[in-house]
């Protein structure tokens, strides 16, 4: 196993970061729970580096005195929950963007979107967004509320298409979203 690159374990489906640690935001909470509840025996996958060993041990050791299911505690969202919340946020933000933004507002929004694509908690999702944004014609359109709404919709459609979900009519969506914000 080579560290320094993010990857998904084919057996467990868990996504690991470049240091060999599970990406908590990218993985569904139940996946961590299942791995953590594995007995500390020969059924645990072979470990090929100290970093991987420490990672697997800490995930197991942290859960030996697990909190009962009846106790509520904060948790990170799984990737699907994170995605739904993110699209709600981005569509709402675009719908509330000024109809005629100043050059400063345009610059701020463009910077936000580029930075957002660098720091989004799901690294593979962030990378997909950066790749999409780098394609010709896909840089953020921030010259008006309607153009930003349409751009967010197109980005959302790119994700929906890869996931096999229905696509939005972005021209209709951007007009409706802009009207709702007024």
From Swiss-Prot:
It comes from the Eukaryota. This is Mitochondrial FAD-linked sulfhydryl oxidase erv1. FAD binds at residues 81-87, 91, 120, 153-165, 176-177. InterPro entries: ALR/ERV, ERV/ALR_sulphydryl_oxid_sf, ERV/ALR_sulphydryl_oxidase. The gene is erv1. GO terms for biological process: mitochondrial disulfide relay system. It is found in: Mitochondrion intermembrane space. It comes from Schizosaccharomyces pombe (strain 972 / ATCC 24843). The keyword Disulfide bond applies. Residues 75-177 form the ERV/ALR sulfhydryl oxidase domain. Its cofactor is FAD. One of its GO terms (molecular function) is flavin adenine dinucleotide binding. Keywords: Disulfide bond, FAD, Flavoprotein, Mitochondrion, Oxidoreductase. GO terms for cellular component: mitochondrial intermembrane space; mitochondrion. Its EC number is 1.8.3.2. It catalyses: 2 R'C(R)SH + O2 = R'C(R)S-S(R)CR' + H2O2.
């Amino acid at each position: 196993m080579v560290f320094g690159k993010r990857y998904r374990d084919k057996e467990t489906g868990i996504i690991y970061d470049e240091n060999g640690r599970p990406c908590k935001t990218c993985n569904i909470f139940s996946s961590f729970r299942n791995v953590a509840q594995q007995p500390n025996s020969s059924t645990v996958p072979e470990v090929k580096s100290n970093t991987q060993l420490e990672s697997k041990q800490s995930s197991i050791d942290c859960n030996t005195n697990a909190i009962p299911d009846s106790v509520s505690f904060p948790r990170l969202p799984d990737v699907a929950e994170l995605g739904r919340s993110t699209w709600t946020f981005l569509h709402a933000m675009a719908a509330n963007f000024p109809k005629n933004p100043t050059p400063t507002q345009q610059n701020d929004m463009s910077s936000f979107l580029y930075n957002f694509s660098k720091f989004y908690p799901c690294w593979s999702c962030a990378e997909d967004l950066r790749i999409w944004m780098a394609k010709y014609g896909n840089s953020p359109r921030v010259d008006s509320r309607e153009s930003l709404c349409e751009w967010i919709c197109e980005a959302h459609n790119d994700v929906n298409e890869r996931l096999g979900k229905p696509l939005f009519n972005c021209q209709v969506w951007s007009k409706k979203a802009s009207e709702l914000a007024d």
